[in-house]
């Protein structure tokens, strides 16, 4: 009996121990589950914090972009007057995150700086500016790999349809479709471009377009014909800063760039060569100035080149008088001033190794503007005359033939304007239409703090200057200067030869 009770107590005790073990296991599972929940929450919080950190970094760049745009772009107020600018930072952030996710799925994660994908941010910022419908060749955004311009350049397309002019009308002279020869042109006259072909003046059907096309409508006798067209290729690639070639009758001047740093070897070469021009041009019938591929640069160099061509560098006074006259080209320009612009100009002058005088002047300007948050404009009273000023000083006997193409831009186009002011009746433009980037100037580049995207905002407006209002060959921003004789990539030599009759020049220069 005693043994049975003992066994029973043992069994009960064992059950009790088992119950405690089960409770302990349940408690342990609860603890593990609770720990798991805590870890999961921590991970979620960390993930949210990381997401918030990423968003805040992107938002910092978006706000910096807005600050530069509002305080560093000369046309900001003008655009805002036409239609209220709706800068939606949250929308741009959403578009960035959407682009980032898409690029990550596609494996396009390069160009990431500080966790920000440059391309994913570039797109919504570019779209914002593009929607404002601004025609400004200096406006753009740049990553490490690409430079996006806001304005689409007007490019002239060529065709195999050539016309001759008779009694004010144009008749088809050459055509792949022989049955059309002799028919009268009834389309837009501006689509016919003068060209030298087979040593005679003809006109080719060459529409001006912003988007690529393979066909266009040609109107003959009020009937429409779909004809093939192709973009004129500007393949000229001479990078010479300044090069001179002389023949008995002509002086060829190749000016490949005005983007020359003060004190550099390029500046020494440029100044050394232009000093030779006055002597070399004596007795010449033609001066051929080749500005193809010249994307511009500093205003100083085209003015010095013009002074050399017109031999106005004999004395400092003569040179200063000419500069004073050429400055009339900018009458009507408006310049934006702000603390952001002043500081960036100072930094740029240091980076470009400008003279101590220029650097100190810009430093003082930045210091004066430092605590001034106001934006203001200068030059508003500087009204442009209603006709192009003409130089009354010593002229040159030679005819000036200027070669241009799609890549002749900015201060290279200013150079053309200066030469028209010297003698507008003494110039023949040859080539393709120039870039058409003259409506603004002094573009300042700003780096966004995290993504390192570069945005370019012009601080000076030339919209109402004498150059853009009074030169007939200037057709507007994105159109540029239209040449008197158009060239394809194959007939530049023929055209220059037709004008100059200088066989030696054609033999020496690979146009």
Across the structure, where does each feature detected by a protein language model lie?
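Short hydrophobic targeting helices and cationic amphipathic motifs
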Residues: 3, 10-17
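Short, Lys/Arg-enriched N-terminal segments with co-localized hydrophobic residues
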Residues: 15-27
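Positively charged n-region of N-terminal signal peptides that target proteins for export
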Residues: 24-31, 290
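Sec-dependent N-terminal signal peptides
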Residues: 32-43
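C-terminal motif of bacterial Sec signal peptides marking the signal peptidase cleavage site
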Residues: 46-47
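Flexible, low-complexity junctional segments that flank or bridge functional domains
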Residues: 50-322, 399-401, 426, 431-433, ...
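Glycine- and acidic-residue-enriched helix-capping/beta->alpha junction motif
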Residues: 281-382, 420
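Low-complexity, Gly/Ser/Thr/Pro-rich intrinsically disordered linker/tail segments
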Residues: 465, 469-511
């Amino acid at each position: 009996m005693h043994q049975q009770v003992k066994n029973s107590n043992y069994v009960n005790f064992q059950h009790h121990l088992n119950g405690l073990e089960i409770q302990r296991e349940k408690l342990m599972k609860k603890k593990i589950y609770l720990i798991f929940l805590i870890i999961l929450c921590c991970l979620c919080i960390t993930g949210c914090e990381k997401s918030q950190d990423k968003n805040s970094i992107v938002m910092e760049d978006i706000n910096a972009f807005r600050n530069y745009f509002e305080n560093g772009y000369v046309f900001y107020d003008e655009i805002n007057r036409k239609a209220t600018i709706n800068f939606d930072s949250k929308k741009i952030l959403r578009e960035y995150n959407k682009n980032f996710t898409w690029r990550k799925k596609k494996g396009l994660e390069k160009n990431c700086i500080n966790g920000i994908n440059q391309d994913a941010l570039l797109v919504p910022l570019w779209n914002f500016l593009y929607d404002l419908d601004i025609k400004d060749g200096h406006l753009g955004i740049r990553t490490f790999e690409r430079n996006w311009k806001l304005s689409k350049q007007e490019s002239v397309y060529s065709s195999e349809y050539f016309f001759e002019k008779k009694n004010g009308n144009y008749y088809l002279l050459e055509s792949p479709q022989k049955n059309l020869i002799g028919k009268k042109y009834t389309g837009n006259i501006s689509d016919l471009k003068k060209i030298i072909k087979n040593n005679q003046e003809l006109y080719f059907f060459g529409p001006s377009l912003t988007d690529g096309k393979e066909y266009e409508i040609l109107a003959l006798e009020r009937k429409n014909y779909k004809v093939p067209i192709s973009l004129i290729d500007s393949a000229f690639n001479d990078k010479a800063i300044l090069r001179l070639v002389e023949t008995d009758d002509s002086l060829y001047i190749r000016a490949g760039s005005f983007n020359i740093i003060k004190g550099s070897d390029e500046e020494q070469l440029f100044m050394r060569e232009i000093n030779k021009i006055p002597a070399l041009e004596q007795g010449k019938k033609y001066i051929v100035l080749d500005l193809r591929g010249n994307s511009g640069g500093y205003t100083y160099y085209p003015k010095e080149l013009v002074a050399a061509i017109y031999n106005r560098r004999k004395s400092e006074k003569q040179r200063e008088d000419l500069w004073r006259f050429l400055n009339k080209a900018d009458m009507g320009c408006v310049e934006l001033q702000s603390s952001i612009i002043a500081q960036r100009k100072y930094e740029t002058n240091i980076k470009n190794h400008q003279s101590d005088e220029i650097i100190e002047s810009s430093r003082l300007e930045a210091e004066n503007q430092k605590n001034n948050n106001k934006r203001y404009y200068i030059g508003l009273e500087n009204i442009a005359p209603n006709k192009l000023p003409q130089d009354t000083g010593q002229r040159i006997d030679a005819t000036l033939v200027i070669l241009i193409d799609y890549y002749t831009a900015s201060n290279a186009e200013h150079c053309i304007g200066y030469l028209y002011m010297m003698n507008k009746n003494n110039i023949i433009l040859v080539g393709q239409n120039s870039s058409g980037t003259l409506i603004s100037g002094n573009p300042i580049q700003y780096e966004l703090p995290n993504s390192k995207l570069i945005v370019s905002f012009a601080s000076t407006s030339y919209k109402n200057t004498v150059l853009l209002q009074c030169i007939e060959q200037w057709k507007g921003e994105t159109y540029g200067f239209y040449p008197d004789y158009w060239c394809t990539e194959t007939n530049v030599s023929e055209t220059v030869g037709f004008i100059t009759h200088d066989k030696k020049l054609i033999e020496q220069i690979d146009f």
